Amino acid sequence: MAAHLNPLSAIAVPPARPDETYGCEGPEGPIRFVGLKRLLGAADFPKAGDRHAGLAAATETEREAARSILAGLTIAHLHQRPLCTADGRVDDVMRVNYDIDADVYGEIAGLTIGGLKDRLLAGSGEEALRLGRGLTGVTAAAVAKLCDIHELVLVARRIVHPTRARTLLGARGTLSSRLQPNHPTDDPRGITLLIWWGLSMAAGDALIGVNPAIDTVANVSAVLRLLDGIRRQAGAPTQICVLSHIKTQLAALEEGAPVEILFQSLAGTEATLTAEFDVTVALLDRGWEAMRAHGPLKDSAAQFMYFETGQGSEFSYGRHDGIDMTTTEALCYGLARRYDPFMINNVTGFIGPETHADNFELLVASLQDLFLAKLLGLPMGIGSCYTLHAGSGLEGQQATTELLAAAGATYFMDVALNTDRMLAYFDTSAHDNQTLREIHGREPAGEFLAWCLGRGILARDAAGAVVRGPEWGRPERFCESSEELAELVAATPALHGFETAGPRPADAVSRRVRFHQAVGRGAVHLPLDVERLRAIHPVREIATAAATHEAHLASPGLGTRPTGAALASLNAEPFAVQVLISDGLSAAAVHHNLPDLLPLLLEGLSAKGIGVGVPLVARHGRVKLAEPVGEHLGADLVIHLIGERPGGDALASRSLSAYLVYRVPAEQRGDAARASGNVDIRHEVTVISNIYSAGLPPVEAAAQIVEKTGQILACRAAGNRLEGMLAAKC
């Protein structure tokens, strides 16, 4: 555990410098790159996000020229040129990255980036860890861009950096997993079943962690207590976490909830971290201090923080400050390093084709992430994932995880049958984790292994090797009766069978899983039928800048902007609320939920005396389309009903979300800025998700949206600020 956190004011950062031109002679004349950001972007493997941002090299020749130039620059050259914001400021994420070991930096400052790569390849894992303490995220990213696949794997595999809570995570020879029992409505029965199933397959030694569908203090506290009770009942030596916003977790901790590991998603630019994630470095510092003083494991755990990252979030929000995806990801790791976390993992691939178009881009990015995080001294796990609207899939994910296991990934996810029932994406499973252990000769964390051996989940063969035991894959052993098991099963969607073949799902189970994925992929490409909506209620149609379905999928920013003609057709209206309907990534979600939801929503708003305009509908819309629409119409609140990306089973491809986008008035912006840390805040958002028949039924969703709309208008706040105000009144 770090003894203290350096004040940001005490971290020395070189002054900003004007952009310089880097160049070399090419076969057809000089090749030039203006600015270090442009050079770093051009030197990387080509990826969709960098291409869309105009940062990727145009040709392979240009890419290799950039790499050659970069290889010849010294560590000091990069160190002395912090990558700044558009207005020339060193943001707080960049500043934290300069909190390095000055002695190590002084020793290696004169090395070129190519020389650093050679030294890493020739040295030990211990030496790589030592050198990493003298590097910023930018410098680490530079050397990663020079590495081929073998080199990324080789260096990462050598580095071992264990951390400890209840279990020792990341010891040599181990491969752990985070058990992720997400449920679309946080139903305790479904969460319980998924935990029993994961534990029965020796998953969860890193963490049992739920991404909550409902991010309120009351719900997060309830889920934490559920996890705590299940862990105690099983006696499993692991730790628990609910991956809600850090503000929610800290409020739950203050109320006595068992927040054993504190979680937060990170971003590599302050603009993304603050404006999109509602987080500041000061807030992260406060969380670290609170856990050190009051965390349930404070007297036994050496570490207690957990972070998630992933290439592309800064680009997808349009807040990358001209920095490529690998470098912003490395800056996330430099920020995480400040808190000496118990665990950290990426979810590169979670966003979609706008950042990573295919399996190869995901493979390269994931290997870079592992290399970077381990070099910077972090206990790196991997969320090797894909979505159904991208050009990646299961076989590409499996090839990636094989290489990541060879490269020494600390842990993977356990998402049952690869299918996240709440977040609508696909990740590794307990079947995958056990398969990788058997292929690569790995074991769970030692304390957890002993528990598994004692339960018959794992066993030792005649030679002493760890093998699957007689109770492996039998979740019913944790239930008191067949009736209890049946009740848990009935409450859990996307259960295609418990049958196994060795460490893998039985073929009949795999066939059902793959069929449902195929149905989900089809839903992505279903066109929105506006006439079906008009049959429910009159609507006004507006167009977005995404002129085609292909452009909509590849460039989501287009779906956030109405066309000029669309805006010209709209005039300010005297209604506090507007309803906007978009297909998003599933027109099926709109078609199946709006017949029940929309009439009840409009009736409920009218019954509360809330004025609402004629609903608008947009093909190829994205979440942030609500902001310019609300601004143009002068609405206080836009209720954006939008199709979620398909995932889970075939039924889940009908899942809808309601984004309640509140336009913060000028007189409220001071309060909103103080609550969020974002001085430029203009909108606050409350989300109600997983609206479909097997999640939150549309009739119930309509009532929730009406209730939340009333709260937003009464309190003149939304999102985390609203929840804080509501909690203070209780």
In which residue ranges do the predicted regions lie?
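N-terminal small/glycine-rich loop or linker at the start of catalytic domains
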Residues: A86-G88, D92, V160-H183, Q303-G318, ...
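Alpha-helix-loop-beta-strand connector modules within alpha/beta enzyme cores
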Residues: L154-R157, A171-R172, S177, V217-H245, ...
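C-terminal functional extensions of proteins
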Residues: P646-C730
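Active-site loop/lid in soluble adenylation, ligation, and acyl-transfer enzymes
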Residues: A486-L567, M725-A728
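Hydrophobic faces of well-ordered beta-strands that scaffold small-molecule active sites
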Residues: G173-N182, D205-V210, A236-S244, E260-S265, ...
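Active-site mouth loops of central-metabolism enzymes
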Residues: L175-G190, F315-M325, Y386-E395
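Long, compositionally biased, glycine/small-hydrophobic-enriched stretches that function as flexible linkers
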Residues: A2-V160, E480-A490
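Glycine-rich, proline-tolerant flexible connector loops at the mouths of alpha/beta enzymes
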Residues: L131-G132, V143, C147, L207-R225, ...
